[in-house]
């Protein structure tokens, strides 16, 4: 009997073993004694164990809904608890031994812990036989509970700190979860208090009944144990029902949280995949993070029951370097810390509530502090190390997240810029294609007209041959125009061949383009058909998925109905237990009556009655044991069904998520296909519109062709008229030849006179230049002498002002006389130079020659620049010069003006070469101002002028029989030559189009230089410009420009006087932006950015920043 009652009563004490596993792992030597003490503790401790059972079951249900890693930890805990219970209960709880132990035996750590637990359970069986040893070991239970309370309190102190640090990233979710957990804890505390009140009430009633019966103390203790076990058995079904309801509610809530976390996980995965980041690059960081979180194996082993081992199990079971591990690690560290905090708070509060309800014997039998002194210190040190590790991991995670955000923003900016450039390029290609088609149509029309013209030409050639034959028959002499036959005719024929070849080549190209377009149209139609087929298949698959979901829902309802049936059976078993309890009470009353009869009356009848009662009692006990076994079976079945329901729900949820994901993917593909179909339809409509436009153009070209035919007929009539005029002109040409011979003699005489005039002019020019050089040299010497004399005068004045006034006055008079003599000499030389000029006839000849060979332009009549005046191209622009530099530059310029005016106030003939007089053309072929030759190079210009005059003499004297029209044609052909030799004439059409494109879009040349897109090319240019500048790292056009230093650095390379870059810092943003924008506005770059907005935002609009930087590049580089 006692054995059976022991087996029945040992079932609900499983949570006690589960509760004390943390202390068993920290102190394995005292683990067996603690488990033995918790088995045979007082009713108060049993009640507290019952409450901890309900709490642990509740937390295990919460952890089972928290994800795969939490369920692994809970299954391992259940398997270890089942092994310890099966070793203590024996054959009655053999069903618990049949639970799967694969999770517990997967790792060596769990196998060793199960072995120690089996050895401790064997020790417990040996210690069960002696009460004395059990009563001695009783104080260890109080110490174990105190140790667990201390460990949990220290855990609850460290974990909220880590929670506070982790809650900075996910504050909203954690606040809601914390509020829900606090509400659950409050409910559990109220439930525990009500049950404690009921237990105290029942204990008082039991003691009153025992006092009324007057039983012995041994029997009281045995009855206490039996009644305690029965009370636990009675209260268990109600606890099972309440915990089932609570677990269901919590399971649904935690499933919702799990779905939210999975959605967030999926979103983060998609973002990482979109950004192109792989976890292999961050494998070292992830391994360090895992190492930090599993620094000491004792901490993970001690926190295994609280969910601390989930991270290590997930790390051991997952492949290193996968994307899912990184995201699940971050989320599970947050969730595990949160759950462990809630569990520790709940355990600590429950232990504080249950401490006043324990008996005074436990408080008196508490062990000394030397036995349990090391455990809290070890726990605190380990918690401190884990807190530091969590801080390091949080810092690593925040830094990694910041880097990922920066990379994401720069890649998003680059993608947007690339998309804009692609849209621009697509528009340009469309325009070019339309222009190409228009040119092709025009070339087709030109080819048709060319073919018609060639036919007409053949017809006219046949007519000409016919007319020639007629002329030969009638013996009429005719003159063939050599010019018509040779140059112009060959050129037209060559152009005709080139046009025909180009037309044939472009016709082949257009045919290829047409074939390509037809192929693309066919492919688009085929893709459309495939898309429609895929849409139908996806719809069918969607219907199939819906049918599968309906079947799963039906199976779920069936499982729920079976669960309700099992609940009904449990309720019936509970009613039966209540009936048996009442019967047992009735039997106890009978036993009490029998004892009273035994004390008063006959003993033989009482012996018979006792035997009968003993038999009835044995039958009742066997019946109770069988009912207990049936109840255990039903509980196992209920647990098995609940696990099956959880698995089915997990599978259903996974299946539903996969179905939703597939449906979303199918919807995305459907939208893509619809968009492609719309694009194809728009292209088709555009092609139809282009066809209609081409037909209209064909009609217009036909009308133009008719008009051209009319014009050709008119031109034929004019050709006939021109032929008549040609004969008249030939007669006039003969007369002109005769006149030309007469005038050629006069022209030769004029050339001889002109040669003499040129020689005289060159001599005059050389003499004048020599005299000007002598005058300049003498003036320079006089100025030097004057400077020396003034210096000597100042020195003499400083030394002897009062003594040497008269001497200085005489000396100055002498100097003035010398200067007057010099001035008189200069005047004589000028008069002599003017008197040595040629006669007015020579001047008139030179002027008439200049007027005949040049068309004067107002731009060329400007005052020439003196040799000492600075070149206009050498002066720096106003943009790159500060105001002080402008003053310093304008000083020597103004000082050099009087010197220039002294030397020469009019242009001299020596500074203009003779070939420029002879070959000077109109203003279109010459720049506005001609460069003048300095006086230092007068000898070179004289030699060049003489050489050129000799060449002109040879050229003029060579063609004796030439007509004056050839010389007159020199002025007309020279502009063509100058145009062909000009730099703009040598530019090909492709370079002209490129220059036009660069003027329109300045970034195109930059993109060709650096390669890639325009945005990346401009970014590389900015990086190249800001090399060597501190505190600047340009990686994008948003966050790299938010402090203004990048603008200041770029503008400092061009305008160093406007921006004091060494005095700037990144903190004073407004000053940086103000300096940069003012410097840009000073050279004419308008500010398109708002200073207040740039100062306020950390990430300004990258498009506005890029436009402003483009304006800077366009101003300074193009």
Swiss-Prot record:
It is found in: Cytoplasm, Cytoskeleton; Cytoplasm, Cytoskeleton, Spindle; Cell junction, Gap junction. GO terms for biological process: actin cytoskeleton organization; cell division. Residues 29-52 have a biased composition (Polar residues). Its main location: cytoplasm. SUPFAM superfamilies: Calponin-homology domain, CH-domain. Belongs to the cytospin-A family. This is Cytospin-A. It comes from Gallus gallus.
């Amino acid at each position: 009997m006692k054995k059976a009652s022991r087996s029945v009563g040992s079932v609900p004490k499983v949570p006690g073993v589960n509760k004390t596993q943390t202390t068993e792992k920290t102190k394995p030597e005292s683990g067996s004694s603690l488990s033995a003490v918790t088995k045979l503790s007082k009713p108060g401790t049993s009640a507290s164990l019952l409450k901890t059972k309900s709490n642990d079951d509740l937390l295990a249900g919460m952890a089972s809904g928290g994800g795969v890693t939490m369920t692994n930890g809970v299954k391992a805990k259940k398997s270890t608890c089942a092994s310890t219970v099966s070793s203590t209960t024996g054959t009655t709880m053999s069903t618990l031994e049949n639970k799967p132990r694969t999770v517990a035996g997967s790792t060596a750590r769990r196998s060793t812990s199960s072995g120690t637990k089996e050895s401790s359970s064997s020790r417990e069986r040996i210690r069960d036989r002696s009460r004395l040893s059990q009563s001695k070991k009783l104080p260890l239970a109080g110490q174990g509970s105190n140790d667990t309370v201390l460990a949990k309190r220290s855990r609850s102190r460290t974990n909220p700190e880590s929670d506070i640090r982790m809650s900075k990233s996910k504050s909203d979710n954690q606040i809601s979860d914390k509020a829900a957990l606090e509400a659950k804890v409050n409910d559990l505390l109220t439930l525990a208090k009500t049950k404690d009140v009921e237990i105290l009430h029942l204990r008082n009633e039991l003691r009153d009944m025992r006092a009324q019966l007057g039983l012995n103390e041994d029997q009281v203790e045995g009855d206490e144990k039996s009644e305690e076990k029965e009370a636990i058995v009675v209260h268990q079904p109600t606890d099972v029902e309440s915990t089932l309801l609570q677990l269901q509610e919590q399971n649904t809530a935690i499933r919702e949280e799990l779905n939210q976390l999975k959605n967030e996980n999926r979103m983060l995965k998609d973002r990482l995949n979109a950004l192109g980041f792989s976890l292999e690059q961050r494998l070292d960081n992830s391994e360090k993070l895992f190492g930090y979180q599993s620094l000491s194996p004792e901490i993970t082993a001690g926190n295994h029951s609280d969910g601390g081992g989930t991270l290590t199990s997930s790390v051991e079971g997952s492949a290193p370097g996968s994307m899912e591990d990184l995201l699940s690690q971050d989320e599970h560290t947050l969730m595990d810390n949160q759950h462990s905090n809630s569990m520790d708070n709940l355990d600590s509060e429950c232990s504080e509530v249950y401490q006043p309800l324990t008996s005074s014997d436990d408080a008196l039998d508490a062990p000394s502090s030397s036995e349990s002194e090391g455990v809290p210190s070890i726990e605190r040190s380990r918690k401190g190390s884990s807190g530091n590790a969590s801080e390091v991991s949080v810092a690593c995670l925040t830094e990694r997240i910041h880097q990922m955000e920066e990379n994401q923003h720069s890649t998003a900016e680059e993608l947007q810029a690339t998309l804009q450039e692609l849209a621009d390029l697509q528009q340009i290609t469309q325009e070019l294609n339309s222009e190409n088609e228009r040119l092709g149509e025009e070339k087709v029309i030109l080819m048709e007209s060319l073919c018609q013209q060639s036919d007409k030409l053949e017809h006219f050639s046949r007519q000409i041959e016919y007319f020639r034959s007629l002329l030969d028959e009638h013996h009429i002499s005719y003159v063939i125009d050599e010019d018509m036959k040779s140059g112009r005719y060959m050129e037209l024929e060559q152009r005709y061949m080139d046009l025909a070849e180009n037309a044939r080549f472009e016709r082949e190209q257009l045919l290829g383009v047409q074939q390509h377009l037809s192929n693309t149209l066919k492919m688009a139609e085929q893709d459309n058909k495939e898309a429609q087929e895929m849409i139908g298949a996806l719809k069918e698959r969607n219907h199939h998925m819906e049918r599968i979901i309906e079947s799963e829902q039906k199976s779920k309802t069936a499982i729920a109905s079976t669960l309700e049936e099992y609940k009904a059976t449990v309720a019936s078993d509970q009613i039966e237990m209540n009936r048996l309890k009442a019967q047992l009470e009735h039997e106890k009353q009978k036993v009490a009556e029998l004892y009273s009869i035994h004390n008063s009356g006959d003993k033989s009848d009482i012996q018979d009655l006792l035997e009968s009662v003993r038999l009835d009692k044995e039958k009742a006990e066997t019946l109770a044991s069988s009912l207990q076994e049936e109840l255990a079976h039903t509980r196992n079945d209920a647990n098995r069904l609940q696990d099956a329901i959880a698995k089915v729900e997990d599978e259903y949820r996974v299946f539903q998520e996969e179905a939703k994901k597939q449906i979303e993917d199918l919807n995305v593909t459907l939208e893509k296909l619809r968009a492609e179909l719309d694009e194809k339809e728009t292209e088709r409509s555009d092609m139809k519109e282009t066809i209609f436009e081409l037909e209209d153009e064909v009609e217009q070209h036909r009308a133009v062709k008719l008009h051209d035919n009319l014009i050709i007929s008119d031109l034929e009539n004019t050709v006939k008229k021109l032929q008549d005029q040609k004969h008249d002109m030939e007669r006039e040409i003969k007369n002109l030849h005769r006149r030309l011979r007469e005038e050629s003699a006069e022209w030769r005489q004029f050339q001889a006179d002109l040669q003499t005039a040129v020689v005289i002019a060159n001599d005059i020019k050389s003499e004048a230049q020599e005299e000007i050089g002598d005058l300049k040299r003498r003036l320079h010497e006089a100025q030097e002498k004057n400077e020396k004399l003034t210096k000597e005068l100042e020195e003499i004045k400083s030394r002897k002002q009062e003594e040497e006034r008269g001497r200085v006055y005489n000396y100055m008079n002498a100097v003035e006389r010398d200067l007057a003599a010099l001035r008189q000499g200069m005047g004589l030389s000028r008069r002599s130079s003017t008197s040595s000029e040629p006669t007015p006839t020579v001047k008139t000849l030179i002027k008439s020659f200049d007027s005949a060979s040049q068309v004067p332009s107002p731009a060329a009549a400007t005052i020439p620049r003196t040799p000492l005046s600075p070149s206009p191209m050498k002066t720096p622009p106003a943009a790159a010069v500060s105001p002080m530099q402008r003053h310093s530059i304008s000083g020597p310029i103004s000082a050099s003006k009087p010197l220039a005016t002294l030397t020469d106030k009019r242009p001299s003939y020596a500074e203009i070469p003779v070939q420029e007089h002879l070959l000077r053309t109109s203003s279109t072929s010459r720049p506005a101002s001609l460069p003048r030759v300095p006086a230092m190079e007068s000898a070179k210009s004289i030699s060049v002028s003489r050489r050129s005059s000799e060449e002109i003499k040879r050229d003029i004297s060579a063609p004796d029989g030439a007509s004056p029209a050839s010389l007159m044609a020199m002025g007309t052909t020279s502009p063509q030559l100058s145009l062909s030799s000009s730099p703009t004439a040598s530019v090909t059409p492709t370079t002209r189009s490129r220059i036009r494109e660069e003027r329109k879009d300045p970034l195109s040349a930059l993109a060709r230089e650096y390669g890639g897109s325009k945005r990346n090319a401009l970014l590389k240019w900015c990086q190249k410009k800001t090399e060597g500048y501190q505190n600047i790292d340009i990686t994008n056009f948003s966050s790299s420009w938010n402090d203004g230093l990048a603008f200041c650095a770029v503008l400092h390379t061009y305008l160093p006087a406007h921006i004091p870059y060494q005095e700037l810092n990144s903190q004073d943003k407004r000053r940086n932006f103000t300096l940069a924008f003012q410097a840009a506005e000073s050279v004419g770059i308008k500010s398109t950015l708002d200073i207040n907005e740039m100062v306020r935002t950390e990430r300004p609009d990258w498009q506005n920043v890029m436009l402003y930087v483009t304006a800077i590049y366009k101003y300074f580089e193009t």
